[in-house]
Regions:
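Short, charged, surface-exposed interaction patches
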Residues: 3-166
Length: 166
């Protein structure tokens, strides 16, 4: 049998649609991420860093006592800055040094979140830069959202096909 070429005019005249859809799922978080830290100030840079290290070691020990695993505690920032006084009509005067150390913590047991925050503050943390809630493994939720998007897209495509008589 010979194959026939499709009618070019029919192809050109056929309506085309560009459709998009999205899918969304809502799932309760199963973990939290907190950034917390210690800021110290001393007369010398070495003293500021030593005080900071000692205080941060206490914070990390408190986290470990709360059941936070070592893999869930990560240094996320370390700063050392000179601190100056600026008297009026005079040259700036060095007051000392400020050391700051931040760690990012993953709390996988949300029932322990409040106790963990209390423990780091009691151990000497004087900076808490926010809490973010999330999923330890978001793949299943992402796949569920993708399925919902595909279903929505199929429904839209069928609606357009029916409306145009295709």
């Amino acid at each position: 049998q010979a194959q026939t070429m499709p009618d070019i005019q029919a192809l050109v005249a056929a309506p085309t649609f560009s459709l998009s859809a999205s899918g969304e799922v809502r799932i309760a978080p199963d973990m939290a991420t907190i950034t917390t830290g210690v800021q110290t100030q001393a007369a010398t840079a070495q003293e500021a860093m030593a005080q900071n290290r000692a205080q941060m070691n206490q914070v990390i020990a408190a986290l470990r006592r709360q059941g936070i695993e070592e893999r869930d505690i990560q240094t996320s920032g370390l700063n050392l800055n000179a601190v100056y006084d600026y008297p009026q009509n005079e040259q700036p005067r060095l007051r000392g040094y400020q050391a700051s150390n931040q760690v990012t913590i993953r709390v996988r047991d949300l029932d322990n979140l409040g106790r963990s925050i209390d423990a780091v503050v009691a151990a000497g943390a004087n900076q808490i830069n926010g809490i973010a809630f999330g999923l330890s493994d978001p793949r299943a939720a992402e796949d569920q959202a993708r399925r919902a998007a595909v279903q929505a897209l199929q429904a839209k495509a069928q609606l357009y096909a029916d409306a145009t008589g295709l």
